Amino acid sequence: SICRLLLALGIGDVILVDRNGILAPGEEWMNPAQKEMAEITNKERLHGDLKTAMKGRDIFVGVSAPNIVTAEMVSTMADDAIVFAMANPTPEIMPDEAKKGGAKVVATGRSDFPNQINNVLVFPGVFRGAFDVRASDINEEMKIAASKAIAALISDEELSADNIIPKAFDKRVGPAVAKAVAEASKRAGVARIWVK
């Protein structure tokens, strides 16, 4: 789901990794869903482990297991790398270690660090917007609209390496996401009623 959204947003290449290694065509251990994703990702057809996958990359998005990334691995990424280490309660790498490795922006799923990425920012507004127009589906266009609505709540003046996303209980988020999702559902043709 994260990968499909990143691709829909126009991210040039995504490399997926699970405990067995990088998803790449021809890997015998992959299940059918992984085989499908391997066909649309990993343009360089890399094989190997997480360490290999991170070399030279701009962004790491982790939603897997605690303490699987090291500062050394982050140091092999592109300059000013972005690290979203969202395993809970212990992220793939702690923020101070990621920054020690050279990460410019670090986010986790935890409220005790800057840039908490929490699904509470998304779900209430997505469902409110979809319910308001009786959407028949929640599609990629609606998800993209939600992500852009959340991002727009941080002004250029507020934006910094430690402030890339609104706080979990920011009262502006739900209504902004709901409005964006409702509008996107209309554009996508899945709204069954029109609400002003």
Question: What residue ranges belong to the model's regions?
Answer:
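A broad, structural surface signal
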Residues: 4, 8, 52-55, 71, ...
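Adenosine-phosphate binding glycine-rich loop
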Residues: 85-195
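Rossmann-like adenosine-cofactor binding region
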Residues: 35-104, 110-112
